[in-house]
Swiss-Prot record:
Its main location: secreted. Disulfide bonds join 4-17, 8-13. Hemocytes. It comes from Limulus polyphemus. GO terms for cellular component: extracellular region. This is Polyphemusin-2. Significantly inhibits the growth of Gram-negative and Gram-positive bacteria. Belongs to the tachyplesin/polyphemusin family.
Amino acid sequence: RRWCFRVCYKGFCYRKCR
């Protein structure tokens, strides 16, 4: 099953899917 979550690091936010 694929799921995505938001990752924020040092002012950068991006979507990470596994």
